[in-house]
UniProtKB/Swiss-Prot annotation:
This is bMERB domain-containing protein 1. Residues 3-150 form the bMERB domain. PANTHER family: BMERB DOMAIN-CONTAINING PROTEIN 1, BMERB DOMAIN-CONTAINING PROTEIN 1-RELATED. InterPro entries: bMERB_dom, C16orf45-like. The lineage of its organism: Eukaryota, Metazoa, Chordata, Craniata, Vertebrata. One of its GO terms (cellular component) is microtubule cytoskeleton. It comes from Homo sapiens. Transmembrane segments: none annotated. GO terms for biological process: cell motility involved in cerebral cortex radial glia guided migration; microtubule depolymerization; negative regulation of cell motility involved in cerebral cortex radial glia guided migration; negative regulation of microtubule depolymerization. Residues 162-187 are annotated as: Disordered.
Length: 204
């Protein structure tokens, strides 16, 4: 029994020490790796250039802005539709009161008529403010579109020089237009402007 214990102790002493994190252990692992694996020092996709990554991020930012614009546009549309509905309801009630002869109107009916006129006036003013805000937002978006188009045009120039071969660059003398960017339909603004027009609410 004592002979077995001494033999096992002797075998354990002869085993090489493996200290994780030591220089010797790290060198032993790297010997089994290929040259291509050792060259990869980043988890990012190495086939993309820094300029391409920056351009891709700019496009993603652009898409995010388009979604935010669309959400804002839908909110404008919902507010305008609700205002038009409220104004039309008040206007219908006012028309019913106006149809009553003046001599037959009670005091409460006259008071209600004045209240309806004031409410309609306030709602029309509120809608005018909404239209003005939509116009300011549209002008701001146009300025942002211009800045983004200039930015993408500047960023695409060096990439075109790298990706195009000399033969293709000689063949394509004509300059290409800037990349098409996502656009938001002006449905909300058009609806805000036309909702109370002659063909719609006839509020004014």
């Amino acid at each position: 029994m004592e002979l077995k214990q001494s033999l096992s102790t002797h075998l354990e002493a002869e085993k090489p020490l493996r200290r994780y994190g030591a220089v010797e252990e790290t060198a032993w692992k790297t010997e089994r790796l290929g040259r291509n694996q050792l060259d990869i020092i980043s988890m990012a996709e190495t086939t993309m250039m820094p300029e391409e990554i920056e351009l891709e991020m700019a496009k993603i930012q652009r898409l995010r802005e388009v979604l935010v614009r669309r959400e804002s546009e839908l909110r404008f549309m919902m507010d305008d539709i609700q205002l038009c509905k409220d104004i039309m309801d008040l206007k219908q009630e006012l028309q019913n009161l106006v149809a009553i002869p003046e001599k037959e109107k009670t005091k409460l009916q006259k008071q209600r008529e004045d209240e309806l006129i004031q409410k309609i006036h306030k709602l029309v003013q509120k809608r005018d403010f909404l239209v003005d805000d939509a116009e300011v937002e549209r002008l701001r978006e146009q300025e942002e579109d211009k800045e983004m188009a200039d930015f993408l045009r500047i960023k695409l120039k060096p990439l075109d020089k790298v990706t195009k071969s000399p033969a293709s660059s000689r063949a394509e003398k004509k300059a290409e237009p800037p990349p098409s960017k996502p656009t938001v339909a002006k449905t909300g603004l058009a609806l805000i402007k036309d909702c109370c027009g002659a063909t719609q609410c006839n509020i004014m």
